[in-house]
């Protein structure tokens, strides 16, 4: 449970921190591609690909944590609607989609 919370907090800070890093990486990537293939890739495409890469890693980590979260929630004797796995999954999916969309 704690690693997931730390991961969410880290990602919320990390996504704002990565914006300048993304810009540098996109600039370097564009320079390499321009030199080797004489083409200009869309900066939006490259940035989107980087965000998809980050999100894939985070979602893999979240998926591994979901089983332990579900067991933890079950141990709290909460009402059954709180224990619905799909609600937890939907909330996390919404959070990550909103973070990437910004």
Swiss-Prot record:
Localization, UniProt: Membrane
Membrane protein topology class: Multi-pass membrane protein
Keyword annotations: Membrane, Transmembrane, Transmembrane helix
Record flagged with keyword Transmembrane: yes
One GO location term (cellular component): membrane
Keyword Transmembrane: yes
Transmembrane portions of the chain: 1-21, 42-62, 68-88
Protein name: Uncharacterized protein YMR254C
Organism, scientific name: Saccharomyces cerevisiae (strain ATCC 204508 / S288c) (Baker's yeast)
Native organism taxonomy: Eukaryota, Fungi, Dikarya, Ascomycota, Saccharomycotina
């Amino acid at each position: 449970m704690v690693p997931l919370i730390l991961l969410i907090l880290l990602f919320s800070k990390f996504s704002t921190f990565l914006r300048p890093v993304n810009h540098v990486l996109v600039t370097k990537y564009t320079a390499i591609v321009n030199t080797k293939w004489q083409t200009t890739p869309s900066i939006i495409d490259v940035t989107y690909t980087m965000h998809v890469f980050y999100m894939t890693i985070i979602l893999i980590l979240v998926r591994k944590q979901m089983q332990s979260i579900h067991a933890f929630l079950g141990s709290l004797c909460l009402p059954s609607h709180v224990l619905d796995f799909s609600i937890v999954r939907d909330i996390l999916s919404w959070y990550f989609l909103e973070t990437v969309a910004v």
